[in-house]
């Protein structure tokens, strides 16, 4: 069976008692990891909490679904040749108004999950680090701080804002 469900809830039929669809199939496949876009736009906080409860902390992967307009000012951008309007943290297709991805980075998605969606810090950190590495078969090199693994570390302040980035054991960004 499937071992990974991309962008759970996004552009898929809803979970129903008569037709559980992708969500039900992912739940019933014991090794299936599920991705959640926790930018505060794509999925309601109660659905995020329910998904953690339903699948367990070890099967949820936080993703950003960020497009290249992430970090840019409000305005019009393109994605796959389509015009996209960015306003605040929302990116929509100019034609039709559908969500067109996210303009929130992964660190902020994790912060939103903890601060605004009440996901426990330990669960959110695992979903943003260990679980993605396990999902793609790279946990032997990435996803945790262990001797012999690649030295990539993000340091966060108590409010979960970025403090420092260490890549391959070298400090590449440090903020006072």
Per-range role (PLM):
Residues 1-21:
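Divalent metal-binding pocket/active-site signature
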Residues 21-36, 40, 52-156:
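His/Asp/Glu-enriched, well-ordered alpha-helical/loop segment
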